[in-house]
Amino acid sequence: FVDKYKDLNPDSQIILIDKESCPNYIPNGINQLFRGDIQDLSDAMWGRACLAAQIESNHRFIQAEVLAIEAPSNTLLLKDSQGRVFEEGYETLVCAMGASPQSHYIETSQTNKVLVTKYYEESQASLKLIEASQEVLVIGAGLIGLDLAYSLSLQGKRVKLIEAAERPDFYQTDAELIAPVMAEMSTHHVTFINNKRVTAIHEIEGKVVAHTEQGDTFQGDLAILAINFRPNTHLLQGQVACALDKTILVNENLQTSQANIYAIGDMVSLHFGILGMDYYTPLINQAMKTGQALALHLAGYPIPPLQTVKVLGSSHFGYYRASVGVTEEEAELYMDTCSYLYQNGDSKNLFWLKLIARKTDGILIGAQLLSKTNALVIANQLGQALALKVTDADLAFQDFLFLQGHSDLAYHLHEACLKLFEKRLRHED
């Protein structure tokens, strides 16, 4: 938001408030460090060095914790790192407090060995502890947990990846698309433990012990929480209208029930047209597009209605993976579906693409990718297809680039859509 609004209104006055010294830190930059993509955590910044050192003269950065939002008086109550409490007024307030890994069912004791790695200071403190450890418990095997487990394995750590569901990335990936990843885990010193819901984590004699609902215990030097992220909206509770899941209710312009307060990013849900409901997706792309959209709106530009199709991607255990829309397992709770798993290549250049369509009319509602080479760009095209309610026939019979040996992805997508179209019509007949 800040970057876009400054571009549109260079003479505006913006006050950026954050308790973090580097609010532009890319979440979980530890992954980049452990994979050798960067040399230092300070390199894991969005677009530039630490934002606090880059504020222009007509803008202000206040490193402080917001203790309270007093909407009736347009005032914030702040506390800085020295413990000084003071007030700051505002005309327009943009709330972008993000989300944190929160659990209502995991009890943790007072220990510095239960880690989270979303923010810069947290990651710095966690890095020292991780480097001194040998065995790490990762709680949660979604995309964040899988990425962390893989990155830790590259540093020679033994990892226990503990998941409440039957398989990793249960909510984003159907079983057949995650099976090759699971097979690869054991070769990276990662032990996957499924169907075990962690209810408590305690430090006992210098070790962390995770207790599960099923009565099991698992021990390690450290535990890292990679569980569901929930919005940091506690300061707005009672100030503006909120949904039952504690996200902030906003209109089409991201305006809350208080006319001069807006909410963006992980604070809000967006409309998920595939299922016809609002859906919470705490993703970086949501933070970017809602922030940019709000900047344009406040600068006087009309913005289109925002929606989500849940585009996710990752790379771990030798595979590139992406998921768009809903899984077949989730979709079947709401509608009849037809799916096709397109498979090409051998184990060295494997390319799998699963397409899921509504059986009645062929409208695409989900897609999943698994490949040995970086084919993640195809997720963007599929995301656009889902947003526009494109059918399997539309994609199968549209023009596509064909240049032998140089446009394989376009051909694979064409073939996958054609196969899905054929299969769905055979079923209808």
Across the structure, where does each feature detected by a protein language model lie?
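Core beta-strand elements of the Rossmann-like FAD/NAD(P) dinucleotide-binding domain
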Residues: 83-92, 213-222, 257
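Beta1-alpha1 glycine-rich phosphate/pyrophosphate-binding loop at the start
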Residues: 1-59, 151-173
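A conserved short coil-to-beta-strand element within the FAD-binding core of flavoproteins
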Residues: 63-74, 194-206
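FAD-site-proximal beta/loop scaffold in flavoenzymes
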Residues: 111-133, 217-293
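Rossmann-like dinucleotide-binding cores of NAD(P)H-dependent redox enzymes
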Residues: 145-200, 285-286, 303-325
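Glycine-rich dinucleotide-binding loop and its adjacent helix/turn
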Residues: 92-155, 191, 244-245, 250-252
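Mid-to-C-terminal Rossmann-like scaffold of FAD/NAD(P)H-dependent oxidoreductases
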Residues: 270-373, 418-429
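Cysteine/selenocysteine-centered motifs that mediate thiol-based redox chemistry or coordinate metal-sulfur cofactors
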Residues: 388-429
